[in-house]
Amino acid sequence: MPTTSTRKSTLQYLGLTLFAVSLLIFTAMLGLDDYKFSEENILDPFRAGDQDTIYWQQDAAAFHQAHLKIAGEETGLFTETFSTTFASEKKLKDTYGIAQARVKKHYETEGLPQAVDDQGDPKMKEDGTAELVQMWQVELPDWKLKNNKAFWISEAATGPVKSRPWLFFLLTFGLAALGGLLYILPKFGAKPGIKNDHIYHNPLTRGLDLSWRSVFLTLTVVGILVYGFYYMDDKLFWPAVTTAISLIIVGLVLFVHNSWGRDARDAGPEDYSGWLGILAGTYFIAFYVLLYWASQHIVAWVHMVDPISKGIFEYFSGREKDPGYSQWFLYGLMYCTIMVVMGVRMIARYRHNKYQIIRTISVMFFQLSFAFMIPEILLALNKGWYGNEATLPFQDMKNIWPLDYDFFYSWSIDGFINNPGSLGVFMLFWGIILVIVGVPLMVHLVGKRWYCSWVCGCGGLAETMGDPWRQLSDKSLRAWKFERYIIHGVLIFAILMTAATIYSFLPNDDYWLNRTSFLVIFSVLLAGAMAVALVAYRKSRLTISKLGLLLGVAFGVGMIGLNVFYMTTGGDNYLFANTGSVQKWYGFLIGAGFAGVVGTGFYPLMGNRVWCRFGCPLAAYLGLVQKFQSRFRITTNGSQCISCGNCSTYCEMGIDVRAYAQKGQDIVRSSCVGCGVCAAVCPRGVLRLENSSEDIYDRAETERVIHISEEGGVSLMN
């Protein structure tokens, strides 16, 4: 009876052992340190600042400190030692709640202070009585607890991780990288390419059957939405809208498109469920939940990489790094380490294909340089942080709107234009030119692969760490229908959120670029897009259902009508909602929940390009250009196809490549990222990645012939 396991060398078993040990240590680190709070660290954020020049602001700061100190003494916050971050957080919340109640009771008993104007003179009401400040201006705000608790817990830590960060860095990052390389390097001695070595039997890579996959996906999505209602506090408009739209999409796909009751392709053989894959996916999901929404519980991991972060900062800045807490250096360093180690694996596996080698090196380079080191260097060169001194912009220079969704936020624009040099203005115009000119031009020339498979960090992680799970992408028609609605829905959400952001940022005065002129430009662009779509549809160049076309036109007309309403009324909040709440919800749902928790956590459950396929708004934008105005296509030589199915199996975007190859039809799909793995795994050389401007509008035709004449030369004819 044939075995379902692959033979591994002693060196590879050693590598697996080292990796498992490093993962155990990495997880156990979170419980090794103790936590003891100091009065100074707790009270420091509540000291009166230079901007607190009004007497009642200084008095409020003093009251806050006094009542926090009393509450801390009552609860034992400053005397007890806590063994976990959870116990520390609970005590902090209890203490803060008591202090809030005491402060509120004080002002209710003693009365609120009198308000003053900009000159410091007391404000008076029309009836001659004194105008008082409002309670929210003097009470202890919830946001200060939320913003400071991770820093407080970090500063309270004492123990082996805090005192020996380098040791734990070597025992985790070092051992994991060494173990991974010991497992990967022997692959250079084996035959390159895929071996079809029981990928649907391996408990790590065989995926889940449809029922289990649906359960995991439903629980995760519902969990994120439920937490979103809590996360948004009392601003429930956008969570409610998202829930309603989600139900509409499900109804459209299952009932309007008659997908209910139809078979959908399982990721693996029937009744199989990869238990190691489930564990890996659960671990990834838990990591991203902690990273985005509960970073106070990963202070040990942050302490471990602090020496590296401080070393980079002090080397380039020439000054000592201010105390603070951020989990993002940890994430960036992990991201780069994983991409490098798994990038070596990618090169070992596809070393027979030069395209794959160059592509893998490219994404590693852009991640290490443009996404990690250059931003860290710019951060070190900052001279101020929302203060009087200007700050250098330090974001990822290769990120493009709408993937970089906060590019047009007011704090981002201020950071660009308020610098004394030209770097900020350059980066602002660079970002705008990339969106308007760079993206369409590059996609026209070579397809969306130039970004998704050669530059993007999200795609880079998917291609390296996610490569073992690329075969789990759902190739069913139902999945494709969900894909089209969801990814273009996210793109529309990004456009609306950005429009609201720009509208709120612009002045409402006589400048040439004000709110009214912006709405006019936005309306003209919408009308132009609808006109192009309708013309293309009439000429049969736009393959879209009538329902899809009607939905698109209805959206465009509705937005133009909304713009006219705001041009005539001049409201402050575009989309009838506070701009801050729109930004907060988009960052939570798309930036964290979709891109992180689902996008990466579901690698072992739904394949490595879940985010790129279903959620990335930039991929949707690139895909629209690729579908209708790109020279790129994957050509097929149908006569050579033996229907082995390798191409479809290893397509990470869920495209049934074999169906195209069997018909001899070139592959022109908006979702295709041009990774080229389908061509790399084809044993007959049926598939080729090519560019040509000869037949842009006829690339996807099923039947074409070559017409040769003296007058017209060589041309493709239907």
Tell what function each PLM region has.
Residues M1-Q665, S670, V677-A680, R684-N718:
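Non-ligating segments of multi-cofactor redox enzymes
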